[in-house]
Amino acid sequence: MGATTVELTEANFEDTLKKGGILLIDFWAAWCGPCRAFAPTFEAAAGKHTDITFAKVDTEKEKGLAAAFEIRSIPTLAVFRDGIMLGQNAGALPADALEKKIQQIRDIDMEKVKDEVAARAKQAKQV
């Protein structure tokens, strides 16, 4: 793992998430060929986008996190912004697709997303 990525564990997950901003998590395992193929792409993006937190979760060591995210195939990329999970992508993304994904995340109107989350929470309390 390069200096530009964070190794996520159950112990540091909440603190990492609370930092806010964009968080990209690569769920991987050492035995996974596609994971090993995606690793240099993920590391290169981490070096290029220093304002984003890039993190990796070894699904063999962190089975609790993998279960919490219902990881069924690896690699899987989980995307957060300002502490809100925006989605997951299963499979190794090519560099251009990862760059496109990062731009899409940057372009999201988070005030609108936060309003939608608050409305759903309010609606859930009424049920």
How does the language model describe each region?
Residues M1-T53, E60-V127:
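Proteins that catalyze or organize thiol-disulfide redox chemistry
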